[in-house]
Amino acid sequence: MSAKIIDGKTIAQQVRNEVAAVVQQRLAAGKRAPGLAVVLVGENPASQIYVASKRKACEEVGFVSRSYDLPMATSEAELLALIDSLNEDTEIDGILIQLPLPNGIDNVKVLERIHPDKDVDGFHPYNVGRLCQRAPKLRACTPRGIMTLLERYDIPTYGLNAVVVGASNIVGRPMSLELLLAGCTTTVTHRFTKNLRHHIENADLLVVAVGKPGFIPGEWIKPGAIVIDVGINRLESGKVVGDVAFDVAAERAGWITPVPGGVGPMTVATLIQNTLQACEEYHDISQN
């Protein structure tokens, strides 16, 4: 295996330790701990696992963690009313609504109801627009986490041909904006892209987020490329794999993220970072 491993687990722990140290400094200075409200509607098992990891991370760094586990029958109006009250709550710096929401609740309306300065997921049109305008505030967690990995490993991005596979609002689209901001020539591919292989073979930096195990054959990877695999797919055997065929890709790439232990841990660590940022940049002024 020639590729160097980008260890997201280690970097995520570094980020958490840094945030925990700032929380301790805040408390020593007589300031309050940052607060995160996590809202889960219904009982989706995958969502319950994600929510538990976010709450645990909050407690580890010394945040105030508030949990709102709402029944599946919760109406859109009830959820919007909860968001309104959390927007006004001076102990809460971040509001996280775990997606997907049940049928009958409008995702867009719900995410837009969160005040932009408490939008620690970075999904609000205001925050996406700030990134578009090259003046980011709160940034989407997974793309920001990927940029943190590249920075911590001193991997330069200026002038690289970057290819993003997948154009979701959560990863692909904000990722393309992050890469533009980082000086890359950026291509976004999606289900209508013709000759996907051609784009990937020319990618100096490849970010794949489609949710299909082994979707990108290792043979397509450009020798020496940086491969960021966002996919987390559980096979019937129980094994967790990414969207890139890892073994062959790792023989060709210069750098690669493993699955698990690559991008995944960074998403939660960045949520924690964003919550601290929201507290210090937006809410300290009015609080202290």
Swiss-Prot record:
Recorded catalytic reaction(s): these are: (6R)-5,10-methylene-5,6,7,8-tetrahydrofolate + NADP(+) = (6R)-5,10-methenyltetrahydrofolate + NADPH; (6R)-5,10-methenyltetrahydrofolate + H2O = (6R)-10-formyltetrahydrofolate + H(+)
Q: What is its EC number?
A: 1.5.1.5, 3.5.4.9
Q: What CDD domains does this protein map onto?
A: NAD_bind_m-THF_DH_Cyclohyd (cd01080)
Q: A single GO CC term, please?
A: cytosol
Q: Which UniProt keywords apply?
A: Amino-acid biosynthesis, Histidine biosynthesis, Hydrolase, Methionine biosynthesis, Multifunctional enzyme, NADP, One-carbon metabolism, Oxidoreductase, Purine biosynthesis
Name of protein: Bifunctional protein FolD
Entry keyword annotation includes Cytoplasm:
no
- What assembly does the database describe for this protein? Homodimer.
Question: What GO molecular function terms would the record report?
Answer: methenyltetrahydrofolate cyclohydrolase activity; methylenetetrahydrofolate dehydrogenase (NADP+) activity
Q: Which species is the source of this protein?
A: Yersinia pestis
Q: Which InterPro entries match?
A: Aminoacid_DH-like_N_sf (IPR046346), NAD(P)-bd_dom_sf (IPR036291), THF_DH/CycHdrlase (IPR000672), THF_DH/CycHdrlase_cat_dom (IPR020630), THF_DH/CycHdrlase_CS (IPR020867), THF_DH/CycHdrlase_NAD-bd_dom (IPR020631)
